[in-house]
Amino acid sequence: MDQIYDVIIIGGGAAATSAAMTLKNRGKTFAVVANKAETGSLYKAEKITNYPGLPPMSGAEMTELFRQQLIDTGATIIEGRALSVLPMEGTFGVAVGSDYYMAGSIILTAGITREKLYPGEAEYLGRGVSYCATCDGMLYRGKTVAVVGGGEEAKQDADFLESIGCSVLRFEKNGRYEISGGMKANLLKFAGEEYPVDCVFIIKDTVSVTQLVPGLSYENGGILVDRRMATAVPGVFAAGDCTGKPLQLAKAVGEGNVAALSACDYLDKK
């Protein structure tokens, strides 16, 4: 994409909505990378009773309110999974599926990833482990690959890989998968069986922030930030559940506002 946004927000929940509203008020250009609303933890909450100014309502109802407010900011909404964020000479490149977007600053509001990494997943990422079939599939044309994950996206990725000539092993069941190899991953273990493969494509709703952005620091299970919501990577800010406990809605909204103001200050001083 030719356009370089001032800010890209990764995540579409309460912190993201708060950040987007602030960026709009400050006259910045911004895009929001978000999965479908129903994949968020707020959506699944039975009832929210502790948010000031609003009556008790279900998580799904509150998610819809936030999503409409997000749309009303005029943000460019990019539906999909952010796969990586890479610093690039004063800007950042964000990979979403097979597309690429650029921004001067990043705000992480991706919540928390409750799924644990499989053994070998982090070690072999980029060396026989991939989160994106359309990005990396052609590298394994004519070879044997595994697709781990259920749902429509996993099915579409497996179908695509077969269409380009890959021999595809499909794994839809939950359980313990283990990836091993030498310089590159070449073996997938599951349910007591071993499967020689050239690549393992792992399809999840979100990519953990520990895999998303290189160079971040962590403390007590969350991204380490200062009072400005600045991370250890200049130009990258974080807000909401991804910064750690308490995992509260009001905290996420406040941090989203602060992160956006700090991103604006960062951009204005460049």
Predicted regions and their residues:
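Phosphate-coordination loops involved in phosphoryl transfer and adenosine-cofactor binding
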Residues: 4-6, 79-80, 141-144, 233
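Beta1-alpha1 glycine-rich phosphate/pyrophosphate-binding loop at the start
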Residues: 5-61, 65, 69, 143-147, ...
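FAD-site-proximal beta/loop scaffold in flavoenzymes
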Residues: 25, 123-139, 203-251, 255-261, ...
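A Rossmann-like FAD-binding core segment of flavoenzymes
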Residues: 64, 70-89, 94-95, 101-103, ...
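Short glycine-rich anion-binding loops that position phosphate/pyrophosphate groups of nucleotides
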Residues: 111-114, 205-207
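Glycine-rich dinucleotide-binding loop and its adjacent helix/turn
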Residues: 112-150
